């Protein structure tokens, strides 16, 4: 509804109430009748307001999430620091498999790609629903929480939750039961946290993100961490900042997906675009560069 239109309708309502209040016929009725008339007036006014503003609760025929993004000219992509999916290069620019994928999709839509750092991963769907971001594109595991709170794309990368600890200790822990009594760092609200919670006797330590979970192990504040296997192999071992750490026991297998708002028409568009990139080999080339395994 346009502001001018709202003002006109607001003026009609005020006039209506004024007429009811000062109508001499109503004013000379008995007290009991006056009360009844006031209630009738209230109900009539309420009905009038409903009729006047029926159109306010309806869309103007542009419920399309795609149209919303194209109108503003930018796709805001929610991410965290998570190599090799999303991370900053030496120039401070966002790069990684997901960052490149998101930029290609933004080009397909004819809009700019803007990255937004999700400070609290547990609030990602709140950020999505309130339109702080348009999509969660950050190595997100397809799980019940994601399926309930968003529109999830087809799976595109195979992942697993893996236990990372000091390299010289990895061989001593080959079953979940063997981890009992250990302190295990996890990203708060992550699938890794769910996997760690299932380890009987483990002390689970929630932290801000997966990089922070690795740091807990490196510093000795935790015995182990549970993170995505994609990150574990990219961030640990010789030549990395975590050369003394290594991935060991695999706890779960899963798939990554991209989350849009519930009912978004961009989900189907991304699925079609993803199929094109798989067919022409673009997605496989990217997966090879980042040492990832594409979902079938």
Model regions: which residues?
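Ligand-binding clefts/hinges and TM-proximal coupling segments of bilobed small-molecule sensing domains
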Residues: 58-63, 191-208, 243-250, 272-296
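Extracytoplasmic small-molecule ligand-binding "clamshell" domains
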Residues: 60-139
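A ligand-binding cleft/hinge motif common to bilobed small-molecule-binding domains
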Residues: 140-148, 195-198, 218-219, 223-252
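Short, low-complexity disordered leader/linker segments with a strong preference
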Residues: 1-72, 295-296
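Bilobed "Venus flytrap"/periplasmic-binding protein-like clamshell domains
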Residues: 76, 81-84, 94-108, 159-214, ...
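Acidic, polar ligand-binding/catalytic clefts
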Residues: 103, 107, 112-178, 244, ...
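Short helix-initiation/N-cap motifs at beta->coil->alpha
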Residues: 63, 115-126, 171, 188-191, ...
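Periplasmic-binding protein-like
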Residues: 158-165, 229, 233-275, 293-296
